Amino acid sequence: PENVDIIEAAGIPEVFCTIWANMVDRCALKAGETVLIQGGTSGIGYAGIKLAKAFGATVFATARTAEKCSAIRRFGADYAINYREEDFAKVCHDQTTGRGVDIVVDIVGGDYLPREVGLLAHGGRLVIINLPAGKTATVDFGLVHSKHLTITGSRMRPRSIPEKANICRALEKTVWPMFANSEITTETYATFPFSKAADAHRLMESSEHIGKIILCSEGI
């Protein structure tokens, strides 16, 4: 996009293509809806917060520390939930007067899944992007049936080149102008030369970062 340098631009495709394909394409996000984004300081998380706010949604997001909750608010989330201190499902229910949320963007899986299904509003959508906490869960499909819920999920990497190209074209048309006028910005936490790739991986595995970690060619 115009007005975005090459390092910042490197942090755009993976996370914004992924969140577009899931939150916009699969969940059909609309203005005025309410969204819960798990892992709000991850690359997927911050991209989801910023894109949802640009679409006119109310955003809840989770993180594990006070510092990360502050970052979530800086990204634009309306509600930052420290999941070590608060029950994210209760906060969402309380702040929506029991209605629940329209969309949950899940990057955790495991025992989060039944709790997320339980907090969806009528016609709500749960989209699963990653499953580090586990690929199996017990879900009350009576709720899915009675509340007309949708459970879906997808990843970018297994998609065909034409599918990825279509997603990129949609971003170019809709999201690139938001970057050009600074309505949306990227969040780069750290950059490393390729020779320090192991250090970058250690930082990522520590989960201390907020935003993207970028590997750069020497001299950039």
Q: For the regions a protein language model found, what residue spans apply to each?
A:
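Mid-domain Rossmann-like dinucleotide-binding core that forms the NAD(H)/NADP(H) cofactor-binding site
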Residues: 5-86
